[in-house]
Regions:
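Class I SAM-dependent methyltransferase SAM/SAH-binding core
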Residues: 70, 76-123
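Conserved Class I S-adenosyl-L-methionine
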Residues: 76, 200-286
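Conserved catalytic/acceptor-binding region of the Class I
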Residues: 156-226
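N-terminal, positively charged/glycine-rich alpha-helical extensions of SAM-dependent methyltransferases
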Residues: 1-38
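A short SAM/SAH-binding and catalytic strip from SAM-dependent methyltransferases
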Residues: 131-145
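A short glycine-rich, Lys/Arg-flanked "PGG" loop and its adjoining helix->strand segment in the class I
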Residues: 146-157
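Conserved alpha-helix/loop element of class I SAM-dependent methyltransferases that forms part
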Residues: 47-67
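A short acidic, Gly/Pro-enriched loop at the edge of an enzyme's catalytic core
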Residues: 123-133
């Protein structure tokens, strides 16, 4: 299979996972700026990674206090900050200029964090320099024929690839049922509910891809069931940062959100309790 076909198949699989076919068709430039218009919303609404999960990831990856980390797609620094608190030196790569600005603001108290506005694909490789390559809900955006080889090459001997994942927060099923008609009217492709088993299967597939790359071994996967409560405004803000919603026509998205808001205000109290899986997958360079 040609690299271009393999890349398209990879993005198609990711598109299936994230309920939008647009990712498979987007150009590299479009993927680079995918979150730019919602960078502030992403910073405000995306769930954080539990401290327990981060602490355990540091333990499994055996990161010492002087460890150097390369972070791929840091966004506004949601995962960067908890790792920076350990005192690690972190080089962060982020393709969105808007997200870079937020990351620099959020990480201003951590002088050991360096943020560069570039993609992992375009970054000039520094071989065998890093103790870990970190990607927090971002590695699926990297072209597969580049990502695993480049990550392995950047790592020192016995270095670790650390993939963090926050799956999409789901409302209670009865709330989903109340919203179903709105989705069927305005965005039928998004009218799905992710049960825990579905999210576990998505994580399993991502982990298997790491091993199938032939660049890493000894995959360790752990997960936590998490909850986060949103106001109606913040829940809609969260949805606005998810790829399936970003891919919608703006008018369709506005109509969808108006319908969702109306139902939520009619059926919910001021808050929505959501649940999701937060996980890490750590594998060692071969």
């Amino acid at each position: 299979m040609k690299d271009s076909e393999r890349t398209k198949n990879w993005y198609s699989e990711v598109a299936t996972t994230y309920a939008t076919g647009y990712l498979a068709l987007a150009t590299s430039e479009q993927r680079k700026n995918w979150y730019s218009e919602v960078a502030d919303a992403y910073n405000r609404a995306r769930p954080r990674y539990p401290k327990e999960l981060i602490d355990r990831a540091v333990e499994v990856a055996q990161l010492h206090k002087d460890a150097t980390i390369l972070e791929v797609g840091c966004g506004p620094g949601i995962a960067t900050i908890p790792f920076a608190r350990f005192g690690f030196s972190i080089v962060c790569l982020e393709p969105s200029q808007e997200a870079c600005q937020l990351a620099r603001q959020n990480c201003a108290s951590y002088p050991s964090v360096e943020i560069t506005n570039t993609t992992f694909e375009e970054w000039e490789l520094e071989a065998e320099k890093f103790d870990a390559v970190l990607a927090a809900t971002s590695f699926h955006w990297v072209a597969p024929e580049i990502g695993y080889l480049k990550a392995a090459t950047a790592l020192k001997d016995n270095g670790s690839l650390i993939l963090l994942w926050n799956m999409t927060p789901q409302p209670p099923y009865e709330v989903y049922q109340a919203l179903h008609e709105v989705y069927q009217t305005h965005a039928p492709s998004l009218a799905r509910y992710e049960e825990r088993g579905t999210q576990e299967e998505q994580l399993r597939r991502f982990g298997q891809t790491v091993i199938d790359s032939g660049r890493f071994k000894g995959l360790v996967s752990e997960q936590l069931a998490c909850e986060v409560t949103y106001s109606i405004d913040d829940y809609l803000l969260l949805l606005s940062t998810l790829s399936p919603y970003i891919a919608l026509d703006p008018q369709e998205r506005n109509s969808l959100f108006e319908g969702l808001r109306a139902v939520l205000e009619r059926n919910c109290t001021r808050s929505i309790l959501t649940s999701y899986l937060s996980a890490f997958q750590i594998a060692q360079k071969i």
